[in-house]
């Protein structure tokens, strides 16, 4: 298989499916694989890099048993524990990210689903942000009903995040308190509501390369718009604490073949950027087109966002948010 020829075929409309033999992605030389992925990214997505930032709106005490997660109540970690944040803190974070040129801002909450009074608080916070800010708004609040997704959409949320985490085969090895199919059903509700669907996973949890390929194909089948790729950073106290970190080469290979299989999606760097050269610069030469940036309300957040924007601009990427262009 000539990987660069395949890249050109994808640019001209070919789409890879579950019926194709994708094993060549696991054995081909990394350099041409990344080169082809970057060509696909440029042709199918363009040079605009989508920057998003998150705030941990509610932390800890999660009843789910995801083996990688510090916020699970099943494990003894040093995770912060608090209820839904005051709206003032959320609005301050949103405005700070907007002032630094971030494209999207999301409230992320621990737990199976945000419900009751806390969900009402979230709706009010989104309505306020939508009224006072121009930044795009996203949410990540677990297994929500179609009715709750509609309320978020009406409040100004345009994208909903809900990771499938891994392949369907491997999912029971990672979590037993909910199922892969429940994840898929939630994403279908997101698409039905007309919101952008953001879903990816974590690599380096003991899965096989075939599991990663399967996850990439599953996301393509679901029509996912934004695919965050996290490289596991093992957390003390969790069942995966002793797993080794992935090599940079493994992360880049994964990002690259995700781009071949999902040519029009935003492939988004998430956790594990520290494992990559210059905090992810190499990934942006291997098919990545988006990243999570910043660090909530710390002083370091602004410095991190500015550093990311500078690095990306040096690669010739467009880091100007739409709301600045419209001003």
What annotation goes with each model-predicted range?
Residues 13, 37, 66, 107, ...:
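Conserved, mostly hydrophobic/aromatic
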């Amino acid at each position: 298989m000539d990987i660069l020829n395949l890249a050109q075929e994808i640019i001209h409309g070919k789409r890879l499916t579950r019926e194709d033999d994708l094993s060549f992605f696991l054995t081909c030389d990394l350099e041409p694989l990344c080169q082809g992925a970057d060509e696909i990214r440029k042709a199918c997505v363009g040079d605009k890099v989508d920057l998003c930032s998150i705030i941990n709106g509610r932390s800890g005490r999660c009843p789910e048993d995801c083996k990688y997660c510090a916020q699970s109540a099943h494990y003894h970690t040093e995770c912060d524990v608090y209820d839904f944040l005051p709206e003032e803190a959320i609005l301050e974070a949103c405005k700070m990210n907007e002032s630094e040129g971030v494209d999207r801002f999301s409230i992320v909450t621990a737990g199976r689903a945000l419900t009751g009074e806390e969900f009402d608080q979230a709706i009010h916070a989104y309505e306020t942000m939508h009224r006072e800010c121009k930044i795009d708004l996203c949410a990540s609040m677990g297994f929500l009903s179609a009715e709750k997704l509609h309320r978020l959409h009406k409040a100004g949320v345009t994208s909903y995040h809900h990771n499938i985490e891994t392949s369907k085969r491997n999912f029971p090895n990672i979590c037993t308190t909910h199922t892969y199919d429940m994840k898929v059903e939630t994403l279908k509700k997101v698409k039905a509501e007309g919101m952008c669907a953001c879903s990816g996973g974590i690599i380096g949890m003991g899965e096989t390369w075939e599991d990663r390929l399967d996850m990439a194909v599953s996301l393509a089948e679901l029509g996912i718009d934004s695919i965050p790729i996290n490289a596991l950073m093992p957390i003390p106290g969790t069942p995966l604490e002793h797993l080794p970190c992935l090599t940079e080469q493994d992360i880049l290979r994964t990002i690259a073949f995700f781009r071949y299989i999902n040519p029009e999606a935003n492939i988004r760097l998430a956790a594990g950027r520290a494992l990559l050269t210059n905090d992810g610069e190499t990934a942006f030469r291997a098919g990545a087109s988006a990243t999570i940036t910043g660090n909530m309300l710390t002083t370091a957040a602004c410095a991190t966002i500015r550093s990311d924007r500078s690095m990306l601009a040096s690669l010739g990427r467009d880091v100007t948010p739409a709301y600045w262009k419209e001003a």
